[in-house]
């Protein structure tokens, strides 16, 4: 508050690496900042005094204050049971965000770096998900041969739906990573209505611009005919800056 930064903006800055010198993982540090923001001025004052004892870990300090019934500088319980229950009601909302973002820590870091800086300096998008799937970058896709299988994660630059002359609907998707672009097409055919199936599974909504998606498909000249699309946006909480 003294710096004139609300907790949402501070949370996004931390997730983007503004306090990277700390050894704590970013999503955990975000939760600590959000928890500290919920404290009263009296609690904050005492927590700062207790900092060296608990290595300035806000969550561990809260745990000790409640379990060990630590007294404040006014010789009263620093955080009584009733006060802790009040604190916990608001804290649990932030804990849910942490539970989500810590599972995909690298993805959360990549997203907020790109959102606030325009690029990610700590990781490549391919490396975020490469442990799950055999991914390619856009350069490798471009260098691949016709009919090669393609597996790629990227950011949607544009996506729109059209209908072919024979009446089948299709979606054109332009996506990119740090190295270049990929043009893909998700089509309905007589054999399989791939676009229709995707829409049915995603509330009749195409991938939005700036969404992060994973595609599987087959290379054909300068385009990839897509077999399946997965939207990765729901893996992390993306609206930290909107928090109050």
Placement of each model-derived feature along the sequence:
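Single-stranded nucleic-acid-binding OB-fold domains
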Residues: 23-24, 121-237
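Sliding clamp-binding short linear motifs
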Residues: 1-145, 170, 223-243
